[in-house]
Amino acid sequence: TRNHMSQLWKERTYAKRMQRKERHKGKTAGKREEGDTCGAVRSSYGITSAPPMVQVRIGSQQRNLLFDTGADRTIVRWHEGSGNPAGRIKLQGIGGIVEGEKWNNVELEYKGETRKGTIVVLPQSPVEVLGRDNMARFGIKIIMANLEEKRIPITKVKLKEGCTGPHVPQWPLTEEKLKGLTEIIDKLVEEGKLGKAPPHWTCNTPIFCIKKKSGKWRMLIDFRELNKQTEDLTEAQLGLPHPGGLQKKKHVTILDIGDAYFTIPLYEPYREYTCFTLLSPNNLGPCKRYYWKVLPQGWKLSPSVYQFTMQEILEDWIQQHPEIQFGIYMDDIYIGSDLEIKKHREIVKDLANYIAQYGFTLPEEKRQKGYPAKWLGFELHPQTWKFQKHTLPELTKGTITLNKLQKLVGELVWRQSIIGKSIPNILKLMEGDRELQSERKIEEVHVKEWEACRKKLEEMEGNYYNKDKDVYGQLAWGDKAIEYIVYQEKGKPLWVNVVHNIKNLSIPQQVIKAAQKLTQEVIIRTGKIPWILLPGKEEDWRLELQLGNITWMPKFWSCYRGHTRWRKRNIIEEVVEGPTYYTDGGKKNKVGSLGFIVSTGEKFRKHEEGTNQQLELRAIEEALKQGPQTMNLVTDSRYAFEFLLRNWDEEVIKNPIQARIMEIAHKKDRIGVHWVPGHKGIPQNEEIDKYISEIFLAKEGEGILPKREEDAGYDLICPEEVTIEPGQVKCIPIELRLNLKKSQWAMIATKSSMAAKGVFTQGGIIDSGYQGQIQVIMYNSNKIAVVIPQGRKFAQLILMDKKHGKLEPWGESRKTERGEKGFGSTGMYWIENIPLAEEDHTKWHQDARSLHLEFEIPRTAAEDIVNQCEICKEARTPAVIRGGNKRGVNHWQVDYTHYENIILLVWVETNSGLIYAEKVKGESGQEFRIKVMHWYALFGPESLQSDNGPAFAAEPTQLLMQYLGVKHTTGIPWNPQSQAIVERAHQLLKSTLKKFQPQFVAVESAIAAALVAINIKRKGGLGTSPMDIFIYNKEQKRINNKYNKNSQKIQFCYYRIRKRGHQESGKDQPRYCGKGKEPIVVKDIESEKYLVIPYKDAKFIPPPTKEKE
């Protein structure tokens, strides 16, 4: 056994180290070969050419023991009996479990130091070793990684241009936390992972610590500022490996790299930026400063540097072992093979030896040898794979906070690749209030949906990929989602997944989107192009492609008879048999109107609230409701015409009117859709336009009955049982609204049947412009109470023709209109502005106040316009962010913000609220300085405030600001309120941009439209927009500069000082400081004093000229 162990030592790095010494003879000390890099970062060490042996006295005997950091116990072959026997002990060794004698309180002596320790007597041991138990007592450390021959490659990292590193002060910490940090830091310094920072390294990053459940402290570092200033690296690995892409193997081993980050050295020139400070309790001593020598936890580039390093280290080894399936993600390594178990283990051992040369270890206790093996959240079995957690938590009826619901859904979503079921009702619950503590109501439908997923997770298993077989992907329409399954054999899925429905995409378009995602997944995981199975018929898909409804098809595809929920193509751009319905709708006259005229002579019209687009769609909806199974539709709305031809499925349409239209349309046999331009003299189109434009007698509600032609009035119906006390008057509102013609007025009169019982109608005149609810005022003249039952005809409505005559003046002629000095106002003037306001709102989506001020309509009418806008309902303007900010004319704030996948640079003038924004490629200093020149050329600013971002704080930026004469200040670090004005501008711009983006192809155009809406269309309390205020202030400044220049000049005067009884002689040439009707201030040249002189005692003269010498 001894010979076998010595042979192992010779085969490893120690023998290579000896050979290397021979090769390097004669070289200058400290010189490396070209291309060499530094080794793993460790504490100071000495190099030995063989396993280190030391002399230790055990009891009364001197022994030669081997240092072995891999051994827990100190082992000797025999012992003379000193100390206390502690019975038998079982040890786990390479050859299995062995048993030895344990002795406590044995005296040990090493280098003159004596300690009491524990030993194990094992006669059959091939070598006597000093284990970690007693090495710790003597403070002995040995790091085998320092004996490596190969060097870890270094990845260069740097700060962004113009950045100087973080200078964030350390916040106070409790004494308990400082003690915990001191213990952690001392250990890291001993292990060589931290170094003491020199005084001229001024960067600082805050540290703190938390106590783990075990009671130990864990150090945390706030690298946010350093991460912000550090140049990014590309990601070496773009995603997690998936078990569905693994091939089935007989043997697997899962390995974990120990201390992965702490083994890789940090690029030396960068280390000074990682400094941090350990405070001294009560400031009893100076603070201690440290820096990182290795990759720190929490630093944004640690994963990338680690991945690049491992890729470079393992590349050669992987190429030398093509017979295995090898996978690595961060510090987890997967090795699978079909080799014999002995050969498989040899390869694993070879890998451990290989990476040990670089200082990495693969701890034995973290190895998983064989199935089942846990890897990256998955559980691998010989034939199938599962998730490590097989069960989802329960979901019960009742209330749940949004925060808890999000966590539950998160548990499910990442398991979709094995469940493959959609949860539309649960996802719907997450809409609405974004407050994490807001509550949601769980009902039976949600519980059933969740339980179906739980059951599927417990039953479902994934399979492994076979490289010799084709891969298939089958798509199907699920519950408001596209579900697909990837397999090689029927009934044995590799994985499944769900693509939730995408708004405003047809069913075929959604299926193709899911097919693209499926294809991408298969290519990434298996390297093969899958054969896609689409639901439906091949001729349908080929027609969709020809029509241009879809633009991409998989390379290999076919169809299967699946449930597609694909709507029949019954909406066409051709004339079909059946009547033709000419539809129109819009704000034609004060209120919205819609209707249609049929080629058979039928007509329909009604009043309804809504925008022009909504009323156009409602007219089509009414025509479809009342039309036959085969019919033609003609509209002058291009928007409605194109929508109908798209033939979307109602379940994916966001607009409720559009969804209702498609639901009705898909039940018809055939519909021919046609478009004609409006107001072009086309007879039928002009007829329907005129028909709905007329003011017609229209009612809303069921509180009135039709009348016969010979009847005088319309009977009104009592809405509910009403009791009127004797001698009392009661106002009874009924379910009725009227829209009278211009030439009509109405009167509510008493029915004779009610008058006979002593109940009369009082007053009741209805003007032609009135459109509110009808109320009937009843008087009971009896001495007893009267009960009017529900549904009783209790009054009548009589229509009258309106007549209007001018009242001639009495005496002197005067002009006046009711509403200025009369009694009340008719409101006839602002009503005409409502259609204009609505039209303008559909373009720019102003708020109610802006519409109210610009179009001079009532605030309530403006609010109705905004509330009826579908776009404004979805995108509410954000609440105001409060904060102390400097405001002033020509003083600006600037900051970057992210909108979807683009970056915006936003400027805001703090006095007027004027916003200027541009799309930028990134947050680099150079691009920011280019945008500064654009901004300066447009607005001529005086001062600017920004945060401490690298682009703003860079030295070239500061020099540019000085050159332009712009006073530049930065906000308070870690205090978002110092940038409150621009932060609010971000939210306002994003909410406005969301409204305009669907209307434009280019996002730059949407940004420009949003700025018009914010700066020009948005009105303040005095009816002025931000642009109005900005231009006014600029003009005021220009006028002041032009006309007040003389007031700044020095003027001269003679003056006199009045005293009691006489006048004193005047002084000549005092400097003049102020002028006006009030007293003036002058400076006497002789006395150098300032005096206050009445204006009448001063005589102003031109400035004196200097005499020539």
UniProtKB/Swiss-Prot annotation:
Composition bias, Basic residues: 16-29
Peptidase A2 domain location is: 63-134
A single GO BP term for this record reads: symbiont entry into host cell
- The Enzyme Commission number assigned here is 3.4.23.-, 2.7.7.49, 3.1.26.13, 3.1.13.2
Give the residue ranges for region: Disordered: 16-38
Active site located where? D68
Reproduce the UniProt comment on modification after translation. Specific enzymatic cleavages in vivo yield mature proteins.
Q: Which GO terms describe its molecular function?
A: aspartic-type endopeptidase activity; DNA binding; exoribonuclease H activity; RNA stem-loop binding; RNA-directed DNA polymerase activity; RNA-DNA hybrid ribonuclease activity; zinc ion binding
Where in this chain does the record put each Integrase catalytic domain? 874-1034
Question: Which family does the similarity line name?
Answer: Belongs to the retroviral Pol polyprotein family.
Name the record gives this protein: Pol polyprotein
Species of origin: Caprine arthritis encephalitis virus (strain Cork)
The beginning of the lineage is:
Viruses, Riboviria, Pararnavirae, Artverviricota, Revtraviricetes
